[in-house]
């Protein structure tokens, strides 16, 4: 068993099938646990609930550096480094991967607003080094409380992303140190 600070692939007892919503001209939309009752019921058997749910759409060529050169796409989900976890299901993953970064010594992240218009902390690529990467073609637990970004998008990609919370404290988050407890029967450890 090889522990991992950034991601775990999951072998789940079901297939996540959710119709891709109409995005219009947006790249991100919110939805609720009422939209995925079977998934929420399964999480409840693990002592978890959905705290927040998003769907993100990325188009080929993401990130488009012509558009994003004034905006950092490397970010954490939230305003502080806290190692909180999400579970992601990606449709049309293609060659896309999630990449995690560490700040170079003496460099800092800065307050920002994500593409989802939520508070985040971001960093410039030149201030970072790659720490880990993983293809997004399987259900996975991801540490979004560390700097990360999506790279190598070669087709329109949809990511259903769920921030989880303990069932007995639905306003809290679950943290990376807890995922191996909650998902012990479903994690596929890399050797």
Set out the residue ranges of the language-model regions.
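Non-heme Fe(II)/2-oxoglutarate
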Residues: 1-72
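Catalytic core of Fe(II)/2-oxoglutarate
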Residues: 112-191
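Short beta-strand-to-loop capping motifs
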Residues: 14, 91, 162-166
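Catalytic core of non-heme Fe(II) oxygenases with the double-stranded beta-helix
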Residues: 63-139
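Secondary-structure boundary elements
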Residues: 46, 92-96, 167
């Amino acid at each position: 068993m090889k522990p991992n600070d950034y991601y775990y692939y999951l072998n789940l007892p079901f297939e996540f099938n959710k119709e891709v919503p109409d995005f219009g001209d947006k790249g991100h939309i919110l939805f609720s646990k009422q939209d995925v009752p079977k998934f929420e019921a399964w999480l409840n058997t693990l002592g978890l609930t959905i705290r927040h749910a998003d769907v993100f759409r990325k188009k080929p060529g993401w990130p488009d550096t012509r558009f994003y050169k004034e905006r950092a796409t490397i970010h954490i989900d939230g305003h502080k480094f806290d190692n909180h976890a999400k579970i992601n299901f990606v449709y049309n993953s293609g060659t896309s991967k999630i990449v995690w970064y560490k700040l170079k010594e003496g460099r800092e992240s800065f307050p920002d607003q994500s593409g989802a218009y939520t508070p985040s902390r971001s960093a410039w690529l030149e201030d970072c080094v790659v720490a880990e990467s993983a293809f997004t073609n399987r259900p996975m637990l991801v540490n979004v409380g560390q700097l990360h970004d999506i790279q190598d998008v070669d087709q329109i990609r949809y990511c259903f992303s769920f921030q989880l919370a303990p069932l007995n404290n639905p306003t809290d988050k679950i943290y990376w140190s807890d995922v191996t407890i909650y998902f012990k029967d479903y994690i596929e450890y890399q050797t």
